Amino acid sequence: MKHLMSGNEATARGVYEAGIKVCSAYPGTPSTEILENLPQYGQEVYCEWAPNEKVATEVAYGASVAGSRAFCTMKMVGLNVAADPLFTAGYMGVNGAYVV
């Protein structure tokens, strides 16, 4: 069956179908709808709003180090705030999966 979705709705569906277990995000257009649409798929994905982009990145990265598949979303400018933990992630690697 075909469904008409926005790009953010399709991203949320892809996150669910990829088996992501932890999703952390900082709200801000245009990425807010991704986390807002995930709960419709049930309790299989833990979703959390973070106080800033750095914390959102650290939550998702921590879950991936612990072996979970994790997803972090934020607007592009937020990558400046999240740069420090992203650089660390590049050196340490993950045990699960980590998508930003």
Locate the predicted segments by residue:
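Residue-level marker of alpha-helix boundaries and capping positions
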Residues: 2, 10, 25, 47-51, ...
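N-terminal glycine-rich anion-binding loops that anchor highly charged ligand groups
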Residues: 3-39, 58
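Thiamine diphosphate
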Residues: 30-100
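Residue-level detector of functional hotspots within protein domains
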Residues: 1, 6-9, 65, 84
